[in-house]
Amino acid sequence: RGPLWSVPHDNENAGFEAALAGVRKHGGVVIAVDSGLAEDGKRRNAAVDRGRPIDPNRNFRDGYPRYANTVLADYRDGARPIIALHTNSRGFDTGTSRCNQSDRPGRGEVSIRFCDDVMQPHPSQSRDWPFDDDDTLAYVAWRNGTSPSTSWCGRTLANADFNVVFERVAVTDGSLSNYALLRGLDYVNFETQERGLDPAALAQARNRLTAMIDRALKLCVRR
């Protein structure tokens, strides 16, 4: 049937374009979050009944079963694996990383050069495109107390010279990656640098994502 494509952030347009390209080529179902009419194109979803806008990728918790069940309904009907698609800020927060602290400061944790007790990077050795960009990578999750090699397709992607970050999960952070791991669902997240809405830049980001998708599906999914 094809993958379940997940695009939880409405401001990550390359992820949405990659999902559309993916479903045309590989089939499956796209689940994308619309952040709301008044606040369209935002990371947080304002289309809530009450309270503040939420991060749609931090709502996969036991207290909200209806949300997860709705988002993942097609997985139960055979749309798999889950392929999450994201874009991220350039670089990483060197103040919170345990490695490469002399790099140019950036934002967040999404980089093959970031590491801590949770995020453990396995960089591409050749750095061939699309992995010439440190912000272009695959995330795979593994359960604390086991081995990174138990992550879904993680070892295969690392052996194929992807940039791979192995995420150690002890307690869920409410993300889809954690939820999928703790429930035994096949899941991988592909990330690339956010390059804006200029058509050429948007295409560049989308193409990095689709390059990872195409290779990973050949490597990880039996047809």
Describe each PLM feature range.
Residues 1-223:
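Structured catalytic-domain cores with a bias toward divalent-metal coordination
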